[in-house]
Amino acid sequence: MDVAIIGIGLHRFGRSPELSGMQQGASAVRAALADAGMAWKDMQFAYGGSQDGGNADALVNELGLTGLQFTNIWNGCATGGSSLHAAYTAIKSGEYDMGVVVGFDKHPRGAFNP
């Protein structure tokens, strides 16, 4: 089975005090789904992670309770790559046909200063 990324979505990078990290993640997922011409209800699984923005699986509260399997991945700075690899493996194995990968965070000013 071939595996491809068919949609991408990003929330604007920068300060967004009016939005939580979770809301920014949901915005990115909606943009990716629109880019792919798909709907959240069509997704069979999701993998995602966040260090400080909340549990990624809680995005279902923003996107809709469809019953899909949402697995939290946490692997520090490699969370995005690990989530993509997990999704690739799930589709390549034939277990699923369509899914979402998302990563998001929101840090206070100066969070990366030593």
Where are these regions (language model features)?
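Short conserved active-site loop signatures built around small residues
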Residues: 80
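Functionally engaged cysteine thiol sites
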Residues: 77
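A short, small-residue-rich loop immediately preceding and capping a beta-strand
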Residues: 97-103
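Conserved "HGTGT" condensation-loop signature of ketosynthase/thiolase-family condensing enzymes
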Residues: 1-74, 89-93, 104-114
